[in-house]
A protein has these predicted regions:
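Non-heme di-metal
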Residues: 1-164
Length: 164
């Protein structure tokens, strides 16, 4: 997934300041003392499960396709990690929750209040992250099942599956 996302970054460019901030957040996740499975669960459920629908609603064809591919894997990861963390009696510390909030706010920083399209409203996505963190579900994402997937004509022929 990292490689596919990096191709998208390479094609669209990256903001140098945002990259520096992202690396600081990455390091904070790595250094955080909570159990690694718990950190993975929080990142997947309350960050990735927010960003992937965001990418499917607001991304270009490449980003929508990659987000759909990643979503399938993340569903399995979250299910497994939820069970393991429950069996081990692990729960997120307040400092891990603060790190989650800092991370999702960093990613959604360019968004603001949007009164005509909820999928461009920062609060919509932040609220979903909170609900996923505390309740494990985000009913406001029921529409994401209908998010538009790229059609064959939106990709170069070289990027289409070959069956022969």
């Amino acid at each position: 997934h990292d490689l596919a996302l990096q191709y998208i970054v390479d094609a669209n460019g990256a903001d140098e300041t945002a990259e520096k901030e992202g690396k600081l957040l990455r390091d904070a996740w790595i250094e955080h003392p909570d159990h690694c499975l718990l950190k993975a669960l929080v990142a997947e459920r309350a960050i990735f499960f927010v960003l992937l629908p965001f990418f499917r609603f607001n991304g270009d064809p490449a980003l929508r396709t990659v987000a759909a591919d990643i979503s399938r894997d993340e569903q399995i990861h979250v299910g497994c990690n939820t069970l393991v963390c429950h069996e081990l009696g692990l729960s997120a510390s307040p400092s891990l929750d603060k790190l989650r909030k800092a991370t999702i706010n960093w990613v959604l920083q360019p968004l603001g209040t949007n009164t005509y399209d909820k999928y461009l409203d920062k609060k919509f996505w932040l609220d979903a992250s909170d609900r996923l963190m505390y309740e494990g579900k985000a009913p406001e994402f029921s529409d994401t099942k209908a998010a538009r997937m790229p059609a064959f004509f939106e990709h170069a022929n070289t990027n289409l599956p070959q069956y022969a």
